[in-house]
């Protein structure tokens, strides 16, 4: 597994992935990869073994819940943050949840897992 500050970003919107990458890099996290759908997320998570996975719920081909279930099989220790505009509460498949409208709260949330 990469360092405790390694992140895989999974979102079908390139603008969201770009904004998250910038935010993570400014905060000293290492973005080890980006994926636009659940299938790619599973492959990259298995290959890169990130500490954190920021995972959108609504994506083409495979949603975040389905992807998280597969990722958990190979990386049970990785922390998955559900990052979605569609969900109102933390889903069972995630370690934490954050609405996309509250992006500024993402870094404090991740830091709680590092401590």
Regions found by a protein language model. Give the residues of each.
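Active-site residues of response regulator receiver
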Residues: 11, 56
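Non-catalytic signal-transmission and effector/linker regions of two-component phosphorelay proteins
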Residues: 1-6, 104-115
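Active-site beta3 strand of CheY-like receiver
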Residues: 48-54
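Conserved phosphotransfer cores of two-component systems
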Residues: 46-48, 70-78
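Receiver (REC) domain active-site loop signature in two-component systems and cognate sites
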Residues: 59
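Two-component/phosphorelay signaling modules centered on CheY-like receiver
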Residues: 14-33
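Acidic catalytic/metal-coordinating carboxylates
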Residues: 37-40, 63-67
């Amino acid at each position: 597994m990469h360092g405790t500050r390694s992140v895989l970003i999974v979102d079908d919107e390139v603008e969201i992935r770009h904004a998250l990458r910038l935010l993570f890099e400014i905060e000293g996290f290492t973005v080890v990869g980006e994926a636009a759908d659940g299938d790619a997320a599973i492959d990259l998570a298995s290959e890169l073994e990130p500490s954190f996975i920021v995972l959108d719920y609504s994506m083409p081909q495979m949603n975040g819940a389905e992807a998280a279930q597969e990722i958990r099989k190979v990386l049970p220790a990785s922390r998955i943050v559900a990052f979605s505009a569609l969900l109102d509460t933390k889903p069972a498949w995630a370690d934490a949840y954050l609405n996309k409208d509250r992006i500024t709260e993402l870094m404090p949330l991740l830091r709680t897992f590092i401590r």
